[in-house]
Regions:
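Short, hydrophobic secondary-structure boundary micro-motifs
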Residues: 77-82, 106, 165-166, 186-191
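Short, solvent-exposed loop/turn elements at beta->coil junctions and helix N-caps
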Residues: 37, 191-192
Length: 192
């Protein structure tokens, strides 16, 4: 199997960290989605990364679905409970972190078009702020939700260095600083 992804995709980074933690070899094929490469469109007609191409040629798309596949590939994995409250806590935390990424990417696309202010932009910043406040209360381990939170805030630091998320979220800062120093995160750091 191989992961079609861009080097700076935070969604792909989440999957690369998960694979690393699970001991899964996950080759990455650097893919530029805006170029509509044939391999990506064959795997995901939406033209979005990441996409996981399996050995039989079939594909799994969307980072939460790929994450679920990776977790299911390792019986007895310790990154997420298979059922019960712990499972749903991790999935909900993953959704919050992915929502932060969604809002941040909307802001990046808007900035590329010169849109840096207005109700839609303000709404994205408010969504990020609210989600971070909740994530600040949900972190503390090293499971799926924790990984997703660290990826999200590291992406904010990477793409929005002037955004002051750290001063309001001390638990999230401590959590991210701890996880970002681990081998899985160091190995998947995006290029500058």
């Amino acid at each position: 199997m191989k992961l079609l992804a861009s080097a700076t995709s935070p969604y792909a980074r989440k999957l690369r960290v998960i694979a690393h933690e699970l001991g899964i070899a996950l080759p990455v094929e650097d893919t530029t989605p805006m170029a509509d490469p044939a391999a990506l469109l064959a795997a995901n007609p939406l033209g979005k990364v990441p996409a996981l191409v399996l050995d039989d040629g079939s594909a799994i798309i969307d980072s939460p679905v790929i994450a679920a596949f990776l977790l299911a590939s390792v019986p007895g994995q310790q990154l997420m409970a298979n059922s019960g409250p712990g499972h749903w806590h991790a999935r909900t935390t993953e959704a919050l972190a992915d929502g932060v990424l969604d809002a941040a990417i909307i802001l990046r696309f808007n900035m590329a078009q010169g849109i840096t202010a207005g109700p839609w932009v303000d709404r994205q910043y408010r969504a990020i702020e609210r989600a971070l406040a909740v994530m600040n209360t949900r972190v503390g381990g090293s499971g799926l939700g924790d990984i997703c939170c660290a990826v999200a805030v590291d992406y904010l630091s990477f793409r929005f260095p002037d955004l002051d998320w750290r001063s309001h979220n001390p638990a999230l800062v401590a959590h991210a600083d701890r996880l970002l120093a681990t081998p899985a995160f160091v190995a998947t750091r995006p290029p500058a």
